[in-house]
């Protein structure tokens, strides 16, 4: 048995990926099919070798390697060949039915009955196409004891899409892992990867996350449709007075502007939109992000990489030696990053970043918990924008109604006020909602707030001091409810902590 790599760079894998992996045998042929080589392990079944000889139809050179070397070559060969798979996906187009494909795939764990991997590739393409059509942000592929479950996150809410045969699980996961350049042999630990695709002429960036579970790996695909995002402040659904105030803040020469909110509340999109009007030849704008979600022309973007100790803090330090005017830090996660960001803002830089807090005032406490002294915070902070995303009513089918006394008490509105609730039609896939918009609270650090921070006022104390001048996220949401943009139930769903 030889453990040496087989040097056959001009040869391509011929067998379906699932069959090659299950039987531990690689058949490599050139384009003319005049030369063929087999790579296998000592345990490869004799019947599999006989079948491969029949498929090849030419004399074979057989090399036996160790299981470890076989896995290495399997991954290398099919990762390289996955570029062909991507081209196949692009060529298929949109005239395929995801649900029909899932039902028609062979009832097999290895697609041995198929001539190639095209059916599973078509299924993945159809799944991605369906997700893009419904503007899904994530695809969840989950394996249970008796079935496979595929769910899409649409407008922030998970919806069950399909329960195909459980046998598809290993095929689907394995092919996705190959396309994302993950280790297909490793099923014991989580893995993260990405792939860039074009579907129906759209550039789609797909982040792939796998996680071991009771009945096999579960996969989540995060979809970034680069064609569907307009990165400017006008498209964020912000109230006009909030937009004007934020626009004033981002044109200040130095200081810190923060965007707060839970995961998936649109913080990164808001930061990108804030950079858009600043992006000019006269400014050096640099970012450190995890991950880089959108590539911005004319802006220097750096990816965090913990494997080589490239943290937010280290990246920020390096950026400050690059003569920046504006700095975007994807997230302030620790005291070290917070300290560097504050010092940068005090030395003539405009710094934009995010924090995981529930409210704008909560950012003040969070930064002080990270070790930022009140006198430094009051000097450096310009403003804090807190935000959530709510589903917007489908304008084609929303239904008016008048609120009763119970809802009048909940909302603070007069009984008999006309609001809207979701209907359901073909345009919104019968959900009643179509798209999302932001609801916001903007805390401006004016002289009064600055003095309160400096003397160590509590979060509650500053809230009382602001009184009616403070427009909370829930109040901003209520304005959108009155305008017929969303529902009171949506606002309550995303602001339960208020």
Swiss-Prot record:
Tell me which EC number(s) this protein carries.
Answer: 7.4.2.8
Query: Catalysed reaction(s)?
Result: ATP + H2O + cellular proteinSide 1 = ADP + phosphate + cellular proteinSide 2
- Sorted alphabetically, which InterPro entries does this protein's record hold? GSPE_N1E, P-loop_NTPase, T2SS/T4SS_dom, T2SS_E_N_sf, T2SS_GspE
Q: Which GO terms describe its cellular component?
A: plasma membrane; type II protein secretion system complex
Q: Say yes or no: keyword Nucleus present.
A: no
What's a GO biological-process term for it?
Answer: protein secretion by the type II secretion system
Membrane-spanning parts:
none
GO MF: ATP binding; ATP hydrolysis activity; metal ion binding; protein-exporting ATPase activity
Domain of life of the organism encoding this protein: Bacteria
> Main localization of the protein?
membrane
**Cofactor(s) required for function per UniProt:** Zn(2+)
Where along the chain is Zn(2+) bound? Answer: 394, 397, 425, 428
Location of the protein in the cell? Cell inner membrane
Keyword line: ATP-binding, Cell inner membrane, Cell membrane, Membrane, Metal-binding, Nucleotide-binding, Protein transport, Translocase, Transport, Zinc
Q: Which SUPFAM superfamilies has this protein been placed in?
A: EspE N-terminal domain-like, P-loop containing nucleoside triphosphate hydrolases
Q: What does this protein do?
A: ATPase component of the type II secretion system required for the energy-dependent secretion of extracellular factors such as proteases and toxins from the periplasm. Acts as a molecular motor to provide the energy that is required for assembly of the pseudopilus and the extrusion of substrates generated in the cytoplasm.
Similarity-based family? Belongs to the GSP E family.
How is the quaternary structure described? Forms homooligomers; most probably hexamers. Interacts with OutL/GspL. Forms an inner membrane platform subcomplex with OutF/GspF, OutL/GspL and OutM/GspM.
Protein name (record): Type II secretion system protein E
Give the originating organism: Dickeya chrysanthemi (Pectobacterium chrysanthemi)
Query: Gene for this protein?
Result: outE
